[in-house]
Amino acid sequence: MLSRITRSSKALNFALGTTAVAAAGYLYAQSRGNLSTSLNKGDVTGQAAAQTFTGDGQWHALKIAKIEQVSHDTRRFTFALPSQDHVTGLTTASALLAKYVTPKGSNVIRPYTPVSDNMARGMFQLVIKHYDGGKFTTHLFGLKENDTVEFKGPIQKWRWDPNMFDSIVLMGAGTGITPLFQMMHHIAENPTDNTKVHLLYGNKTPQDILLRKELEELASKYPDQVKVTYFVDKPEGDYKGEKGFITKDFLKQNLPTPGSNSHIFVCGPPPFMDAFSGNKVSPSDQGQVTGVLSELGYTKDHVYKF
């Protein structure tokens, strides 16, 4: 097991690695590294931030500020909030609903989890994979910078409280990484949260590993708290990680026991969910845990499905 770092030492490292500002909340926001690259000194002030999404059901048309190609079928979209003093208003773990109206007047709505810091001012980022035949992703990938997309929310998934578990395991595949990364990033960068985090992340090839740089930066920055294990079906080049799929034997050897103060969070495409935990019955009904995790003795008391 990874050695447990103390709350005081983590807080000290956090303080040494950031620039002092007037309010502790903005000190926390300033420490985010890569995910806050679009912020500048004028974005982090003593002025209270305005929340964009308050759960009032209102749709907000937001401009695409930047589009970056992440892989052959995935892009990172940066959206501008109403002003540089606005934050999303999201908490961990929560998502937004995105909408577009078809030429025939019907609404196409999809949920997306931002990968940028919840405290980032003036912007938020989504990492989105294009799916053949996907109505929303096809529309989105046809847009350009300065085009707009409508959003509303937040949609609360799991309400995270610091130190609610001694450790958690995040199991994901493909774009299922986004809510898992949101949790990992939030926990690791919070100086008062000592929760151990182990990410198990499966993909077809090393090139398909989304947010790889950000994941490895967190693991490097917090080696006593964050561990990342990749699983790749078709390893290439200098890839260092597990080969093939996440196996039952690996889980048996590496997961905390069902009775421990820990929790497992799972997110991925339907076949991945079917294999390990079973899919949700509905957005509000987690259903029973099935698949490999059930075979290992885990129940809905130990597992959450995004």
From Swiss-Prot:
Q: Which GO MF term does the entry hold, naming one?
A: cytochrome-b5 reductase activity, acting on NAD(P)H
Q: Does the keyword ATP-binding apply?
A: no
What's an example Gene Ontology biological process for this entry?
A: cellular response to oxidative stress
Q: What is the lineage of its organism?
A: Eukaryota, Fungi, Dikarya, Ascomycota, Saccharomycotina
Q: What does the record give as the reaction this protein catalyses?
A: 2 Fe(III)-[cytochrome b5] + NADH = 2 Fe(II)-[cytochrome b5] + NAD(+) + H(+)
Q: Which PROSITE patterns match?
A: FAD_FR
Query: Which species expresses this protein natively?
Result: Eremothecium gossypii (strain ATCC 10895 / CBS 109.51 / FGSC 9923 / NRRL Y-1056) (Yeast)
Tell me the domain of life: Eukaryota
Name of the protein: NADH-cytochrome b5 reductase 2
Q: Which gene encodes it?
A: MCR1
